[in-house]
Structure formats: C-alpha cells, structure tokens
Amino acid sequence: MKKFFALLFCGFFLFAGNVLAQEADADKVKLGDDMPSITLKSESYGDVTPESLKGKVVLVSLFATWCGPCQLELAEVQKSLWPAYKDNPDFKLLVVGREHTEAELKKYNERKKFSFPLYADPGRKVYSLFADQTIPRAYLFGKDGKLVYSSVGYSKDEFRKLMDAIENGLK
C-alpha cells in the first residue's frame, strides 16, 4: 500500500510539473493582442522603434544560431518570404537572435549569407516580451498592431499558413 501511495504521489508531481511547463511555454502574446513595444539597436541595419513599425505588417521571428528547426525556418525565409516581401513598404521583417550579440550574428551571417536583417537580443529583452522558452517562434502583426498569427517550431505547413497570413495582412 505504501508503494501505491508513493507511486501516486510521484505521478501527481510529474503531471503537475508537466502542466506547469506547458503553461510556462505558453505565448505571452495572444491572437488579437497589441504588439509589445519593441526597440532594437543595430549598427548594421539601423534601429527599430515602435514608431517605425506603425501601420506596417510586422513579422517577428525569434531564433538562435544553434537551433536546428530555426535554421530550417530561416532558410525558407531566405528562399521564399524575403524575396516576396522585402520591397514592400508596408511589411517589416524582424529576425531576432535570442541571446546573441550583433557581433555573433554578423559572424553567423558570414556563413549563412542571409540577405535579410538579423537583430541581436543578447539579454532576451525582446524575446521575454513574447515567451519564456522554445524557439523558433513567429508572430505576425497586422497594420493595426494586433497579433493575427503565431507559431512555435517549424513545419512547411505552418510556414505556408504564415505566408498566407502575410498576404492577407497586406491586402
């Protein structure tokens, strides 16, 4: 009987821990929420301020250089998303390197040769506005500044949904 209660006790805490982990991973920004106030400094690409994003469709893509799924997503951004929208004045792409400095991102991009801007977030200040853990993450905000789409992880199907959401936002 003692073993039963010990197992039951352990099972309860494993379940509770799993629920808490899922809650900790939940998006801080929900569909329909306003875009958090983002400021990014970059010598290479210029600074981003909340004022510079007003009235634009804004995609915030959060990644790390060591993350495999992030690499897949960024390769798709380079291949299909960036060529389609880079010249659209109503669209802004913010690819933000979680825990990376501008120097680290510059070195990383020398290898990857991405043509889109990479913004540093060494202290997770921007990342922490959106989530506590898990990358890649994508957040798309409409011209009104409201969240219209979000995803965690990478799949081709989710990326197609993101592209559709961008297209709809720019109409």
PLM region spans:
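Thiol-/selenol-based redox modules, centered on thioredoxin-like
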Residues: 140-171
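N-terminal "domain-start" segment that seeds a small globular fold
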Residues: 21-50
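Short, internal strand/loop/helix patches
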Residues: 94, 109-143
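Positively charged n-region of N-terminal signal peptides that target proteins for export
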Residues: 1-4
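Short loop/turn microsegments at loop-to-beta-strand junctions
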Residues: 35-36, 58, 135-137
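Short active-site neighborhood of thiol/selenol oxidoreductases, capturing the structured segment around
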Residues: 49-71
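Structural microenvironment flanking redox-active thiols in thiol-disulfide oxidoreductases
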Residues: 71-112, 125-128
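Bacterial N-terminal signal peptides
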Residues: 7-16
